[in-house]
Amino acid sequence: MIRKLFAFGLAAVLALTPVQAFGKTVSITNVSYDPTREMFEQYNKIFEEHWKEKTGEDVEVTQSHGGSGKQALEVANGLDADVVTLALEYDIESIENAGLIEAGWQDKFDNESSPYTSTIVFLVKKGNPKVIKDWDDLTKDGVGVVTPNPKTSGGARWNYMAAWAYADKKYDGDETQMKDFIKKLYQNVVVLDSGARGATTSFVENGQGDVLVAWENEAYLSMRDYPDEYEIVTPSVSILAQPSVAVVDEVVDYRGTRDVATEYLNYLYSDEAQEIEAENYFRPTNEKILKEHSDVFDLSVDLVNICDYGGWDEVQKKHFTDGGIFDEIYER
């Protein structure tokens, strides 16, 4: 009701006031997840130039970052976002279920509304003193693991499912052994932060743990910011992490920002934007640009797809809802 009254009032003001009195600036808010801060800071600058050239309007983009699940809950509970760029499809579906995003949002943009991808890797201290090579090593005695909480972080759910996929292959689908494997891994977790950036801070800046399970881009950013202190280990099995994007229909309709919000997400697929994504260590969906960065990205790693486990609705229900497998195996 409040939003309807706002929209009515705005329409009345627009009808009575000359357009030029409002100037030529439009503002939108992008609610995103933890590791995209630096990338969107760069992207927003080129998008503002693109929008100015295309329409003559100035645009200001506000960013909001945090654990993906927590961010989705904030939007569902009323945080105004013109667009959401979250860690996984399920988090956007939760906003859809709150009635703020129209059904079929996955088909509004290319590649199922996933303009870039990532995967999960390990970040270890230079020289790899614990000799960590694969997921098995994260279950050994004396190894301290840092990973975010899958109850609040989308990246953490990708981490968990990458480990689950490894256990699936190792134990040929025997869920009893798979659960035991995941339990041993989480018994070694020394800190369970609410989001991916918090986990990176715990490991890189606070010196907690021996290995950080991380988004590929987070690991590379840490190596860039702390040269000669860390190295990346790519496990034998990981997962194709597909962050998703969507326009928040209810918000853009009452704010009158649908055109600029839609173009904001569309332009993420442009060559210029795909280069920025690659520079920030996200994998571009443009295959040509991805291959141009093959010196950075390991394109030979065995990446499973979340669809192999029934998609995010099934995975969320089985693993991460209250009483799910994560609750079974994680001893607080």
Language model: regions and residue ranges:
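Short helix-loop capping/hinge motifs at secondary-structure junctions, enriched
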Residues: 127-133, 152, 165-173, 251-258
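Extracellular/periplasmic juxtamembrane helices and adjacent flexible linkers that interface
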Residues: 252-332
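Sec-exported extracytoplasmic/periplasmic mature domains
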Residues: 44-53, 76-80, 89, 96-100, ...
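Ligand-binding pocket segment of bilobal, Venus flytrap-like solute-binding proteins
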Residues: 171-236
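Short beta-strand->loop
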Residues: 31-33, 124-126, 144-171, 185-189, ...
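N-terminal segment of the mature folded domain
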Residues: 23-152, 300, 330
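Positively charged n-region of N-terminal signal peptides that target proteins for export
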Residues: 1-5
